[in-house]
Amino acid sequence: DLNVRQYYMLKSDAVMSGVVSDVTSDNDWQFLCEQNVPTGTTAETPFRIQGTIPHPFLWDTEHPHLYLLKTQLWQGEQLLDEAEVTFGIRDAVFKKDGFYLNGKKLRIRGLNRHQSYPYVGYAMPESMQKLDADLLKKELGLNAVRTSHYPQSHYFLERCDELGLLVFTEFPGWQHIGNDTWKAQAVVNAEDMIRQYRNHPSIILWGVRINESPDDDPFYEKTNAVAHKLDPTRPTGGVRAIKKSHLLEDVYTYNDFLHDGETPGCDPKKKVTSDTDKPYLISEYNGHMYPTKAFDNEERRSEHAIRHANVLDAVAGQEDIAGSFGWCMFDYNTHKDFGSGDRICYHGVMDMFRNPKLAASVYACEQDEIPVLQITSSMDIGEHPGCNRGNLYILSNADSVRTVSYTHLTLPTNS
């Protein structure tokens, strides 16, 4: 069954109609439902229209099926207002042992994304917003993205809906919690986020805690209550950098920066969470632990890639971790005290212009749609101290890779 809630302020009776059509496949069916809207219905008094979609197709990461709902508000023959929204039908659940989409366990594998671009900041059009989603899904082979640390362009979210890219979004903020007036506005921000974005099927988790902030139970009880009231279908998360933090949300989301190249890729769930019966998701890793420029030497760029691989490998080995989001998709502008002296954070697996670093191939070779074969060295001895090429890595999603040392040898045809 399909339940639609609309918000209006009316001075006299009206009729609301709703038409649903299939926008993903070639099905030409549609259904119509109508409901009388009584005088006095306001923005705070929603009314519902109900209908049934016959044999619905489910939205998932491989087949992101979408439907279109068009609603119209009529008084007699006069059309007062109309609206259109796309939506999907899916069952997304976080459990103690991981994340399940439509009943199937799915390991979340994603990156964090800022909404910034070189020179123009956030002022980029629809096409570029959508291109970032394409890069995440098609070039990097990911199934998820975290919109750190604020809700992002609807164009980006719409493309995530179309591609089947899972989204963890959160209300604005970074580390700081202000006074009571500030907190009241933050609760409003959480409410606005959910009202504006809740029809996106790609969104699987609401972030209702200021990123990396300390515990504040009275404040976060309010943000969680708002989220559960406005959208009881989705769980809440709260990104922190604190182990054994007070858990008011449905999912313990934690920035795990344990790995330094020598230490394990991540901490086990039981060492981090305050309630091991609740789901656990790693919301950030790497990033500032090993900033790497696209023009750094090969050793550093290679080490950067291997650190990302180490964390992915560690997460994959622990069945009770729902997944992880690396920090981050691309380099970005920052304030003078946080970058590399040039107001740029070189934390991305891509540079600011979305050109891939070696670490990008680590993620790309996790998918099986596009062949990936990347060598971490140019093999030029002048690039290395003492002409010693050091460790060389081959990043690939192939079942096997054969290397040949002498170019005069004939390659086997099945290599």
Which residue ranges define each predicted feature?
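Secreted/periplasmic carbohydrate-active enzymes, especially glycoside hydrolases
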Residues: 1-159, 163-167, 189, 204-205, ...
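Substrate-binding/catalytic cleft of secreted carbohydrate-active enzymes
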Residues: 132-138, 144-355, 359, 363-392
